[in-house]
Structures are given as structure tokens and as C-alpha cells.
Amino acid sequence: TGAAGFIGWKVSTLLLEEGYRVVGVDNLNDYYDVKVKLWRLDTLKSHENFKFYPIDIENKQALEVIFQDNHIDAIINEAARAGVRYSLENPFVYLSTNTLGVLNLLELAKDFGTRKFVQASTSSLYAGQKMPFVEELPVNTPISPYAASKKGAEAMLYSYHYLYGIDVSILRYFTVYGPAGRPDMSIFRFIKWIYQEEPIELFGDGSQSRDFTYIDDIAKGTIKALKPLGYEIINLGNNKPDKLIYAIELIETYLGKKAKINYKEFHKADMMATWADITKAKNLLEWSPTVSLEEGIKNTVEWTLKNWDWIKDVKL
């Protein structure tokens, strides 16, 4: 699900390259500019083993048709309303997609005998905990409706694992970036703004840090999580927090331009820092990240410039 989304697209791409049949689902909503989603989707449609359904995971009846038409061995649920700040403006859609949408998929997995479920979750759940974040920390105090909706999904997944034996891998992703990334996230926005010589919007002073994790690493970890694990929550992160201002400096270097910074007040629903402990991913999935922030931002800048003919028109 979320096949035209950032992570769903890359996971689908790698699975198709490995020879799997992929059934992609996406509602192509306009939370961010659909041009980016359509570009991703076009690259997937060139594969003969890719079948696409333009539907919403909130629509159980439409989902049921997919399960009737296809034998689904595993569900990788990357469909979600994303974005911490927007969840304060429209909390209802976060619950209906991120929690009730998961329930729809679980009911169909139960009814049609799909034994494996990989769920995209978030480092946002760790707000207020001590770093580096380990999976066993109690994450009972989400500071945004977005985080709360993902916590609800994790809890529902446990119930269905316990009751019906569905094998569940929950992946808590840490700040994912890279080529064809989300235009609502800082790296995409900063590259576009700096290249166009427009001022960038920076919430806070840039000293906040993120465990930036490159898209290819995230997608490979997600595919490794298809193995039978029972019920496990696993961090996928770079295990190395970097200050936001450092990411900006890297973008300046690779573009050969200086950023004009428009400082804004730090947002209450944002976290000051994220840092993943990835011991569990190493042990259970034999996964660890391979792409440094320097290399990842360089790749992202190069991809942006190569595709500038349509990216220049992407709304931020």
C-alpha cells in the first residue's frame, strides 16, 4: 500500500527488480503535490509484474476486491497520512487512515489467509524518551495526532497477531530522505528553495538533530522484515543524528549556492532530536545502513537537478 508514496515506491521497485509480483494500492491524495507521486508511479508501471489499484485503504469493500482477484502472501503497509504538523489541523483523517485503515487490512488478512504483515511506523513515538531510542521504551505519550494514530496501529496489530497468528513486523522509521522524496519534508524543500535562491523556512535555529536515513537503506530493511518474526518492533535508522543546519550546509556545498534562512518559531509538535538504536535490526534482520548523509544528500541533489524540468513546478 502507498505504492506511489516515497517508501512504498522504493520498496515496490526493489521487489520488482528481485522478480516478485507486486500489487500496488494508493489513493493518490493531494496532501503533497501529486506530480511527485505520478512520477514514481510511472516508473513502477514499466514493470510487467506490477498491478495498480487507485483506492484508499479506508475503503474496505474496494480492498476486498484486491484480495479476491489476487493471492496476497504478504502486506507491506506504507499507506498513511504523514506529517506531524498537519495532523494537528486534520486529526480525523489521521485516525481513519493510519489506524482504521490498518484494521481493514488486518480483517482482510485474517479472512483471506495472508500470514505476513509489515507495518510502517515512526520514530515520532519516542518523543520525550532518552536517546538512543530502543524499541522497548514505553511509548505511551505521543505528542501529535500523527504519532497517536501510529501507536493505535501498533496496538491493533498486536491484537491480531495474538488472536489470529498473523506474523507482524513493525518498523519505526527515522527521518527518511533521498531521490523522489516527499516535498513536505525538509531535504526536498531545502534543495528546491536554495537552488531557486528563495529563502528557506527553518523552524527553530537548526540545532535540532535528526537520524537521517537514506531511502534505499530503508527499503532494503523493509524487505528483510518480510521474514517470519512473530511480532517484533524494529527501528530502522542511521544510528547517527545530524543537526539540521549541517544538512543545509551539505546542500549548499553540492548546489554551490548559499541558503537565505527565514527563521520561524520551533513547532511544539516537533522533536528536538531523534537517534535510533539499531541493535535489533542488526540482530534480527542482519540489516544496517550503508549510505552516509553526505553521500545521500549528494545523490538527492543530483536527482533533483536531473529532473528539474518537472520538479521546478512542484508546489511546496
Which stretches of residues belong to each language-model region?
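A conserved pocket-lining segment of Rossmann-fold NAD(P)-dependent short-chain dehydrogenase/reductase
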Residues: S87, E136-T141, I166-P179, F190-T213, ...
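Hydrophobic alpha-helix immediately C-terminal to the catalytic Tyr-X-X-X-Lys motif of short-chain
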Residues: G152, M156-Y160, F190, A247, ...
